[in-house]
UniProtKB/Swiss-Prot annotation:
Localization (cell): Cellular thylakoid membrane
Name of the gene encoding the protein in the UniProt record: apcE
Spans annotated as Phycobilin-like loop: 77-144
CDD domains: PBP_PBS-LCM
Organism: Microchaete diplosiphon
Topology in the lipid bilayer: Peripheral membrane protein
Protein name: Phycobiliprotein ApcE
Segments forming domain PBS-linker: 252-432, 514-693, 710-888, 922-1080
């Protein structure tokens, strides 16, 4: 890491002293409260005494020389001490006087006068009756001889005495002795290194006595002066405080120390400690301080939020403040505010602020805690911070964490900027991590190729010099640590040997053919006959004055100007030789057009960069150069900046009086922009140039023979027909009040599923219930389609008359809009049909991922014209182009089957024919509506959301059907548990509790527990409560032992409370069959 790098450029304004008003208001603001009665009374008293304090300060200031003189005469002998007092500079009157010379010269001549006082007659008279008028003289005190002490030491001593009095007056006006404490404590040790400290104590006592002598008739003023003078004496006598050391838990952090005076001068940050003996209100204040530190606001006051159980425990002493902080940082509220919206790096930074009161110190520290949060999440990070030795050293078990910012302890330089930003109230609004970005990007990488005051790299040269904006939305600044010694890389336009950095003598050399054309004006009336300047070259001269003028406009303005913007008078003077090219350039740069273009509308920094490029022909080198022009612009204005550039030595050496400025140096990005040729494009700059070649498929597809019109039309008509473009998709919209649109959608569903409009063929209103539910929004289009597939009409028309393979073809046609893909899909659905029936087959189609992706919940299936795989397209065409009632030929067997390598020679045809009927499910429509069909139908998931009563009733019926193994939606009255149903409807119990009580009830015992052996009961419980069969014999043995020892209810509770049940069903989901083999 570079020692010159720093973590940003946040401006810090350390507080130098405390005042009564600011300290009181700051303390209330830190605690997020209004001023208390005592604080208001203290402020009122202070402001009421304001006039008196100002009067005291004015009196002491006017008589400061007299007071200092008495103190100096008390400790110095053998000369006039006041002659060494340096007076503050005063404004001199504008009148002719003789120069007084310096003080030493005046002392020799005897022309210097001093204000000295030894107290007057009455004061001397008092001193006769008071042996020690100014206080007890410390032992070992001896007056100091002026001649031996020396002029330098005398000047320092008189200066110190004057400053002591000045500190006292400042503190009196501020109403807080903090100024005295900050500037006086520790000076005794410094003074004793040069001389004895007893004379200073005697002098301070004399300052106090002399100051009080001016307020003998004013008791209130005497009290105020005595109070602050006593503080001055006490603080001077006090020992030098030790520095505040910053804890250094690891070797990768910086070991720092903060002088105690900086800590005393900083704003007071109250520290809250939870003690058992505190009152209720004081404990509430401590808890609110913890909220402010962890959540960055008082959530009790702002949002009426609190963690009441934790508050009670910490108030009663059940948990310490350390545990209280730990649990707050793990609370759901903290996770929502400071964990979920951020990436892990930013979470670490915020957690450091909230728990340790600082930001991360190093890259190694960030890596350590990043590993912790990646492996264990937020709880592991909180535990690591709270259990760290640093937390114990700073806060212990009882102290609420606080911000350890500027003035509280020494601050590190490498994370300076990010840490100051982290302490701001707006820190949670920044999503981009700052610390790891600073450590990884700024310190381990070279400086970017950018302007030192730019906010990023310069991909275009018009972006240089942009001042850092005030980011209020998605802030992501990452400052680059450019020091004043950093110099930008500039490329010379011309021979590299003529660079002005390596070869300053070649600054006036022209670039020749390697650079821009140079325009010089050397054949004017005023210059003919004169000797050419050294280095002048006719080759690069321009005899046409108008060409030089046009080049000057192009260089200064970057474009041609309008006729009304031209400077006609200056052009005429240039043509007549009355004006040099240099002065003409100066006139153009000071014109209103130039000022409005490159000064008024831009940042000062950006304007200086533009002007520097236009007039001097190169960008600025760095901060040191641009700061000089910035200072000139701030003090003298725009015209002074132009004069400073044109009058510079570099301008004279590079262009002289007769050369138009030209572009001498460019940045690397500028060179790349000007040389985007094929051979010069780098891979990291631009795209790779590809040679244009005709693709191979175009070459191979080129027609070589002549084709007739019928042949062309035949080829055009191949493939997907126009019907795909003309297909109309019927979709249910959110507005279901349009009954005509709903009826149109229902008719489209009938035509898709039954391949005809079924209204003329229905004698009974078989689908009235489904239509009503769809119109009322109780079911979706997907459920409506599924209901049509379960109907008796569909079973009669498309299941009973056909073999299973034909049923699969028709099912994929009606519900997926295509033919079967391959034999694998046919075998899959054939197995479902053979084992579970038509309802399970339709449910598998409608519940498939393909159906959800293509049609979703609100779209009627339609013909999709699939083109992949290619073998499936002709099958779909044939399936759709033939009428269902024409024949029952199979379409899908067009797939070529793979012959096995080994054939069973002994297998007879009669044997194969014997198994033909075994692959068929029952051909009876009534049989499919019976027990087996209901038991094997695909699982439908019921979840209790509590939105309406009808949905809750469906959930209750589903529970009875699953747990009691009922095959009808009509639940017998003697099976119902009305008390449990009422509790579930009112939300007193969850679905999980309902299942637990139902499986433990007498009804379940009579049906599945009493009639069967234990092993069979365990199988029933697995199927009814977990939706699967036992996986291993060990599961049956484990629950057999539990049932034998504790009974049925214990087994039910063990299964319902298991992790598997919680994972798949949770609290609100009805158990459902999770395996296709269930019920076989």
């Amino acid at each position: 890491m570079s020692v010159k790098a720093s973590g940003g450029s946040s401006v810090a304004r350390p507080q130098l002293y405390q005042t009564l008003a600011v300290a009181t208001i700051t303390q209330a603001e830190q605690q997020d409260r209004f001023l208390g009665t005592g604080e208001l009374n203290e402020l009122a008293t202070y402001f009421a005494s304001g006039a008196k304090r100002l009067e005291i300060a004015q009196t002491l200031t006017e008589n400061s020389e007299i007071i200092v003189s008495r103190a100096a005469n008390r400790i110095f002998v053998g000369g006039s001490p006041m002659s060494f007092l340096e007076k503050p500079r005063e404004a001199e009157l504008a009148m002719a006087t003789v120069a007084p010379g310096n003080v030493q010269e005046g002392m020799k001549l005897g022309t210097v006068t001093y204000v000295e006082s030894r107290g007057g007659f009455l004061e001397n008279l008092r001193s006769i009756f008071n042996s020690s008028p100014s206080g007890p003289t410390p032992p070992g005190f001896r007056p100091i001889n002026v001649a031996r002490y020396g002029p330098s030491n005398m000047a320092k001593s008189l200066r110190d005495l004057s400053w002591f009095l000045r500190y006292a007056t400042y503190a009196i006006v501020a109403g807080d002795p903090n100024i005295i404490a900050v500037n006086t404590r520790g000076l005794r040790e410094i003074i004793e290194n040069a001389c004895s400290g007893e004379p200073t104590i005697v002098a301070l006592q004399e300052i106090k006595a002399a100051s009080l002598s001016f307020f003998r008739q004013d008791a209130k003023a005497t009290e105020i002066v005595s109070q602050y003078m006593d503080v001055l004496l006490t603080e001077f006598k006090a020992a030098t405080p030790s520095n505040k050391l910053r804890q250094r838990p690891s070797g990768d952090q910086q070991g720092l120390q903060l002088p105690q005076i900086y800590f005393e001068a900083a704003e007071r940050r109250p520290k809250f400690v939870m003690k058992p003996g505190l009152s209720a209100s004081e404990k509430n204040e401590v808890i609110r301080a913890a909220y402010r530190q962890i959540f960055e606001r008082d959530i009790t006051r702002a949002y009426s939020l609190s963690v009441s159980d934790l508050e009670s425990k910490v108030k009663n002493g059940d948990i310490s403040m350390k545990e209280f902080v730990r649990r707050l940082a793990k609370s759901p509220l903290y996770q929502k505010q400071f964990y979920q919206p951020f990436i892990n790096s930013r979470v670490i930074e915020l957690a450091f602020r909230h728990i340790l009161g600082r930001g991360p110190s190093s890259r190694e520290e960030v890596q350590k805690y990043f590993s912790i949060i990646s492996n264990g999440g937020l709880p592991a990070l909180v535990d690591a911070l709270v259990d760290s030795p640093e937390y114990s050293d700073y806060f212990g078990e009882e102290t609420v964490p606080y911000l350890r910012g500027l003035g509280q302890e020494a601050q590190e330089c490498r994370n300076w900027g990010p840490q100051q930003d982290l302490f701001n109230y707006s820190a949670p609004f920044r999503k981009v991590p700052q610390f790891i970005t600073t450590f990884a990007c700024l310190y381990d990488r070279p400086l970017p190729d950018q302007h030192p005051y730019g906010s990023g790299n310069d991909p275009l040269e018009i972006q240089f010099g942009a001042i850092f904006p005030k980011e209020t939305r998605n802030p992501n600044t990452s400052p680059a640590p450019f020091s004043k010694d950093t110099r930008r890389i500039l490329i010379n336009q011309g021979p590299g040997i003529n660079s002005q950095v390596s070869n300053p003598g070649a600054r006036g050399e022209f670039p020749g053919s390697l650079g821009p054309k140079v325009f010089r004006l050397d054949q004017l009336p005023g210059t003919i006959g004169k000797k050419a300047a050294k280095g002048a070259s006719i080759k690069f001269s321009e005899s046409s004055t108008q060409a030089v003028i046009k080049a000057a406009y192009l260089q200064v303005f970057g474009r041609d100007v309008y006729e009304g913007q031209r400077l006609k008078v200056q052009e005429i003077k240039l043509e007549n030789g009355q004006l040099s090219v240099r002065e003409f350039i100066r006139a153009l740069a000071k014109s209103d057009v130039f000022r409005k273009t490159y000064w008024t509308s831009l940042y000062v920094c950006k304007a200086i960069e533009y002007i520097h490029r236009r007039l001097l022909g190169r960008p600025t080198y760095g901060r040191q150069e641009i700061n000089k022009y910035f200072d000139i612009a701030a003090k003298q204005g725009f015209y002074a900046v132009v004069d400073a550039i044109i009058n510079s030595v570099e301008y004279s050496e590079a262009f002289g009086e007769d050369t138009v400025p030209y572009e001498r140096y460019l940045t690397p990005s500028g060179v790349a922009l000007r040389q985007l040729r094929v051979g010069s494009i780098r891979e990291d700059v631009g795209g790779k140039v590809q040679k244009q070649e005709t693709p191979l498929f175009v070459t191979l597809g080129t027609v070589t023979d002549t084709r007739t019109e019928p042949d062309i039309q035949f080829r055009i008509n191949q493939g997907v027909s126009k019907q795909r473009e003309q297909t109309k998709v019927f979709k249910q919209v959110a507005n279901i009040s349009d009954k005509a649109a709903v009826q149109t959608l229902i008719s489209a569903a009938y035509r898709q599923i039954f391949e005809r409009d079924v209204a003329p063929y229905i004698a009974k209103n078989e689908f009235s219930a489904l239509e009503s539910k769809l119109s009322n929004g109780e079911i979706t289009v997907k459920e409506f389609i599924e209901g049509l597939g379960y109907s008796n009409l569909y079973i009669k028309e498309f299941y009973t008359p056909y073999p299973n393979t034909k049923v699969i073809e028709l099912g994929t046609k009606h519900f997926l809009g295509r033919a079967p893909l391959d034999q694998v899909e046919i075998r899959k659905y054939n197995q479902i049909l053979a084992t579970q029936g038509i309802r399970a087959f339709i449910g598998a189609l409608v519940s498939s991922a393909e159906y959800a992706e293509v049609f979703g919940e609100d779209t009627v299936p339609y013909r999709r014209y699939p083109t992949l795989p290619a073998a499936n397209f002709p099958n779909t065409e044939k399936l759709y182009n033939q009428l269902t009632k024409q024949n029952d030929d199979l379409v899908v067997p067009s797939f070529k089957t793979v012959q096995p390598r080994l054939t069973l020679a002994g297998t007879s045809s009669s044997g194969r024919n014997g198994f033909t009927d075994l692959g068929r499910s029952s051909t009876s429509a009534q049989g499919q509506l019976g027990e087996t069909a209901n038991r094997c139908k695909p699982a439908r998931i019921y979840r209790l959301s509590g939105t309406n009563q009808a949905e809750t009733q469906l959930v209750i019926n589903a529970i009875y059907s699953q747990v009691l193994d009922l095959f009808s939606s009509d639940i017998p009255a003697n099976y119902r548990l009305n008390a449990l149903e009422g509790k579930l409807q009112t939300g007193e119990i969850s679905v999980r509790e309902f299942v637990r009580e139902l499986a433990s009830s007498d009804i379940y015992c009579d049906r599945f527990y009493t009639p069967y052996p234990s092993a069979k009961v365990i199988e029933f419980l697995y199927r009814h409560l977990l939706g699967r069969a036992p996986a291993t014999q060990e599961e049956i043995s484990e629950y057999n032992k539990l049932m034998a020892s504790r009974g049925l209810r214990a087994v039910v509770e063990a299964i319902v409370d298991s992790q598997e049940y919680a994972r798949y069903f949770g609290e609100d989901v009805v158990p459902y069959p999770r395996s296709s083999s269930l019920g076989n």
